[in-house]
Design a protein with these regions (language model features):
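Short, flexible loop segments at the rims of nucleotide/cofactor-binding pockets, characterized by
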Residues: 53-58, 94-98
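A glycine-rich helix N-cap at a beta->alpha junction
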Residues: 54-81, 86
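Short internal beta-strands
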Residues: 35-40, 77-81
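Histidine-anchored nucleotide/phosphate-binding helix
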Residues: 18-31
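N-terminal beta-loop-helix "entrance" segment that forms/cooperates
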Residues: 43-57
C-alpha cells in the first residue's frame, strides 16, 4: 500500500495554509492510504493544546474540527523536535496536544 507523509509548515501566521495539510491527511486516509502528518517550522505551534481552536482558514472547516477528525482516524502526527524546541514548546511535553489514545504527538 502507498504511504504518504504530508508536511505542514505554516502555523497561526497563515490559517488557510495551516489547515490544508490536515484536509489532505484526512482525504488520503479516507481513500485508503497510510498517512502520517508531519508538522515542522511554524506548524509545530498547531500541536500545542488549544491553539487549533483559534485557527480558521478562508472558507475552510475550522482546524479544531479537522484535528479532532484526524485524531479520531488514528492518523499519526509527528512534530519536528528541533522546531518545537526552537519555539520553546514540547520540553517537557505537557503543552503538546494529546491523541484520543493518550499519546502525545510523536517527535521524529
Amino acid at each position: 500500500m502507498t504511504s504518504f507523509i504530508i508536511a505542514g509548515n505554516r502555523g497561526t501566521d497563515d490559517p488557510t495554509m495551516a489547515t490544508l495539510p490536515f484536509i489532505a491527511a484526512k482525504v488520503a486516509h479516507e481513500q485508503g492510504y497510510d498517512v502520517v502528518l508531519w508538522l515542522a517550522n511554524e506548524a509545530v505551534i498547531l500541536a500545542r493544546k488549544g491553539v487549533a481552536d483559534h485557527v480558521v482558514g478562508v472558507n475552510l472547516v475550522p482546524l479544531r474540527d479537522l484535528l479532532q477528525v484526524v485524531q479520531a482516524l488514528g492518523i499519526p502526527i509527528w512534530v519536528c523536535s528541533a522546531c518545537a524546541v526552537a519555539r520553546q514548546i514540547g520540553r517537557p511535553r505537557p503543552d503538546l496536544a494529546r491523541t484520543p489514545r493518550g499519546q502525545s504527538a510523536r517527535s521524529r
